[in-house]
UniProtKB/Swiss-Prot annotation:
Job description of the protein: Attaches a formyl group to the free amino group of methionyl-tRNA(fMet). The formyl group appears to play a dual role in the initiator identity of N-formylmethionyl-tRNA by promoting its recognition by IF2 and preventing the misappropriation of this tRNA by the elongation apparatus.
Upper classification of the organism: Bacteria, Bacillati, Cyanobacteriota, Cyanophyceae, Gloeobacterales
PROSITE patterns, per the entry: GART
The protein's name in its UniProt record: Methionyl-tRNA formyltransferase
Organism encoding this protein: Gloeobacter violaceus (strain ATCC 29082 / PCC 7421)
Keyword Nucleus in record: no
Family from the record: Belongs to the Fmt family.
GO BP term, pick one: conversion of methionyl-tRNA to N-formyl-methionyl-tRNA
GO CC terms: cytosol
Gene name as annotated: fmt
EC number: 2.1.2.9
Keywords linked to the UniProt accession: Protein biosynthesis, Transferase
Amino acid sequence: MRVVYFGTAEFAVPTLEALLAAREIEVVAAVSQPDRPQGRGNRLTPPPVKAIAQSRGIPVFQPDRLRKDLEVLAHLEALQADFFVVAAYGQILPQRVLDMPGRGCINVHGSLLPKYRGAAPVQWAIYHGEPETGITTMLMEAGLDTGPMLKKIAVPIDEDITGEQLLAQLAHLGAGLLLETLREFDRITPEPQDDSLSSYAPLIDKGQYLVDWGQSARQIRNQIRAFYPYTHTFHRGSRLRLLAAELTSTGSEQFQPSAIIHVIKSKGFEVVTGDGALLLTRVQPAGGKEQPAWDYANGCRLMPGESLGL
């Protein structure tokens, strides 16, 4: 079975490794996004999928825009693959590419389709307080994550799990599900998606990391978990990342949202929200290290009555 693998992000690595370990599958090429500057030094860094593929001697193509790169398109066509497999690639495949493999294009998607079609399904599922999510393998078509579904696995969303942790969990489940899908492909009846049940999970905009203290305590906690480690507020003019929080029953009717009402020894500090209060337990100040919120409060002599967001 000849497979071309399309993937870029860390989420795509377990599926590639599973394909490489399967004796009946030959990964004949990988397609990934171009190297990008990363880190404080803006060093040009290869995507995780490229690094794995190159270490195994697999040809890697990195077109800026796949649909416009005629040379790469010609190479892909010449490979005569049975399947194209896609996981967290980052570009929409044009119809010409979808038509190339002999048996089809299969996508590994991090949600229970048709819910959360789009680029960030895991984070938005946590943000919206979903009790479960999962992995779907699907046949690809021109629409965004609209193709017929092949197999699914449902996973409960733990109350404390972050988007980063859930992505890693789903990535490994997706690898196994993809192998099952390929091996059982001829016996699977594709299931059309019900568009009336669909929802969209767009790319995360940096503005969505900023906390609005007028929201409910649960919603802010979901935001902290979903977008970990980037959710933040401001304190004394500097950004303060919020890394973990607990719901609390503390009343706060006499205070406005964003006010700090209690500093609790060895725990953290409570902040007024739109419907009560939230106990912050781990934070990271600008230019500093992740630390217990109590250590931060103690170090900067945090006082009840101060406000965050300023």
